[in-house]
Amino acid sequence: MERPAPLAVLPFSDPAHALSLLRGLSQLRAERKFLDVTLEAAGGRDFPAHRAVLAAASPYFRAMFAGQLRESRAERVRLHGVPPDMLQLLLDFSYTGRVAVSGDNAEPLLRAADLLQFPAVKEACGAFLQQQLDLANCLDMQDFAEAFSCSGLASAAQRFILRHVGELGAEQLERLPLARLLRYLRDDGLCVPKEEAAYQLALRWVRADPPRRAPHWPQLLEAVRLPFVRRFYLLAHVEAEPLVARCPPCLRLLREARDFQAARYDRHDRGPCPRMRPRPSTGLAEILVLVGGCDQDCDELVTVDCYNPQTGQWRYLAEFPDHLGGGYSIVALGNDIYVTGGSDGSRLYDCVWRYNSSVNEWTEVAPMLKAREYHSSSVLDGLLYVVAADSTERYDHATDSWEALQPMTYPMDNCSTTACRGRLYAIGSLAGKETMVIQCYDPDTDLWSLVNCGQLPPWSFAPKTVTLNGLMYFVRDDSAEVDVYNPTKDEWDKIPSMNQVHVGGSLAVLGGKLYVSGGYDNTFELSDVVEAYDPETRAWSVVGRLPEPTFWHGSVSIFRQFMPQTPAGGRGFELNSGSNDVDAGYHRLPQNPEELH
């Protein structure tokens, strides 16, 4: 039997070597052997040490001893501003890798570790101080953390303050610097039960020192999310506040809030704006609502499902009360959803159904002037427009009435519409032809015109279209390609393709992103995929799944009340119980015309 060949190399590693080396160095220090430098702390106390150990433990000492400074050769080095007991702890850490952080030494030790560049000790002190945060010290702790660039502690203090803002004393809040208060008001995590509380916080701060702080009021009011302050409070308190009434920028913010609540503000057409995003603590969330469609067996669905992107969960809403049929159109007007027209295969519908999100109920409203199917509907300046090949009409929810408008100059088959920059755009093929065109409606003149926007993309069918941040997005129904048109610059662009095709799927805008759902995929299988496009990253991602594979459904986004998302341990903002400023009622956006006018 042959013996194995001897190894040319035997790799060996002693896992205990590092610890053994530290112990050996500590022993040499205790025996005062090979010491080559003495550190002099504040008060004149001496600490003999080894240069090599200090340089290996701290970039501060490495730079000191390796450079051309006098200290690189000196036998004694004076350290200004370092308490002896803190230097003792840091030296012990250099030789052992251990330090005991306590309530008595955490802050001075962090200061010394920051000065002498012991990042691990500094981080340990910050972690300890995070556990000591309370109502009495959280504001000072945030100041301390930011002064010493302790990001973990600063972030923890910020979260604690936002979570417990309602429990902080009036004196604590009123002495906040402007920049700090603005940071809190702008943060999604500010824990208030209603946005009125954020307004009161800003107003209380200004009233604590009106002569010096009143000039900052427009900045503060801009950080408050006025669109989600209830209408009666806007009228009774915000509009009546002298600081608002005498300030044009504040009046513009107030007008914006009222337009939003009256459904005259298209948040999708504008650029990203934090004021149009409710705080999670208020329980209000922007959701994706799916209406109707067909399942894998081509059976008609009357279910209405909503998807909350904050939780990733689906919930049922009130079912559609009637037979939807086919060829209907769905649109969101303010915080309500409207379903118009359609047919049962033999009869066209002129009926219009409205979903009231505040009471989770469908009701029938005034019928259209003309029954129709395979039309398109969009909202422009708070009015609902219905566009078909041979007619256009407009609905005013305040008066529950329809008005006939000029039809398109060139009739189009199966067009899709979107509102952008104060105009209504219709995209489709000319009736009886394959030529694709875009027409534009001007509500001021009640006239349609052909849009000369150069060579259109090679669409086989009218694409689904929505507006986001002043751009019109066209999602093709027979491919994963997506085109973009900028009407202001008259420019075309193409964004990355979707992960799959969505033939017969649905398109909506939610939270500043495009959401495409359902339809048939590349393999002609009915899909339940929901994917979203983020304009900031220019990327598509799968964000969820439909309750079941669906096609020919409609989707829109609205705001709806859910259970408030209050972080654990946070009570949120407690309003003065003696004040009539805010009631404890159900927080919702105004829904009914009588509430809006």
From Swiss-Prot:
Presence of the UniProt keyword Cell division in the record: yes
Region annotated Disordered, chain positions: 570-597
GO MF annotation terms: cullin family protein binding; ubiquitin-protein transferase activity
Subcellular location: Cytoplasm, Cytoskeleton, Spindle
PANTHER family associated with the record: KELCH PROTEIN (PTHR24412), KELCH-LIKE PROTEIN 21 (PTHR24412:SF255)
Function: Substrate-specific adapter of a BCR (BTB-CUL3-RBX1) E3 ubiquitin-protein ligase complex required for efficient chromosome alignment and cytokinesis. The BCR(KLHL21) E3 ubiquitin ligase complex regulates localization of the chromosomal passenger complex (CPC) from chromosomes to the spindle midzone in anaphase and mediates the ubiquitination of AURKB. Ubiquitination of AURKB by BCR(KLHL21) E3 ubiquitin ligase complex may not lead to its degradation by the proteasome.
Name this protein carries in UniProt: Kelch-like protein 21
Organism: Mus musculus
